Amino acid sequence: MKLLIDFFPIILFFVAFKVWGIYTATAVAIAATVAQIAYLRIRHGRIEPMQWVSLGVIVVFGGATLLSHSETFIKWKPTVLYWLMGGALLVGQLFFRKNLIRTLMGGQMELPDAAWRAMNWSWTAFFAAMGAINLWVAHAFSTDTWVNFKLFGGIGLMAVFVIGQALYLSRYMKEPQDDARTAPEDAKP
């Protein structure tokens, strides 16, 4: 369900673009993101900082698109968001000696420091690359191609990257212990 909530604005943006065009789709994306934040606030009582940033970016760049009637601003929005996320990881690591990936995921798994650093740097590089790829697609191809890339290409690249991260992390995952194998002989039924 959380995944559907996360993708709600982009799916509505895609559908609205196909039916009504970029400007209506932009307004729909803004409204859907506001609705998403309201739902999360009511349902969970708390909004993650990145969700607030995402709302701010869509309101600013979507609003600029609607006010100027220039689709350029909405096309920059994913790049700005990717670069803000990558920049936060980079600044956290370099200036504050804080690994934000570890902060976000540390309670879910135990990894050596080197693995946490590798994950932080790989996510930083991934976000930088995604921002650059978005700019390239936005300016080298039609708006229709960019919208298709935004939904299918962006999500596809993210899925491939996450699978790669999972494969990398799998070497650090401990095998679950079988209690029957490790129990003393006299304790077995």
From Swiss-Prot:
GO terms for cellular component: plasma membrane
Topology with respect to the bilayer: Multi-pass membrane protein
Protein localization: Cell inner membrane
InterPro entries, sorted: YciB
Keyword Transmembrane: yes
Coiled-coil annotated residue ranges, if any: none
Keywords, comma-separated and alphabetical: Cell inner membrane, Cell membrane, Membrane, Transmembrane, Transmembrane helix
Domain of life (superkingdom): Bacteria
Pfam families linked: IspA (PF04279)
Family to which the UniProt record says this protein belongs: Belongs to the YciB family.
Functional summary from the UniProt entry: Plays a role in cell envelope biogenesis, maintenance of cell envelope integrity and membrane homeostasis.
Protein name: Inner membrane-spanning protein YciB
Organism: Paracidovorax citrulli (strain AAC00-1) (Acidovorax citrulli)
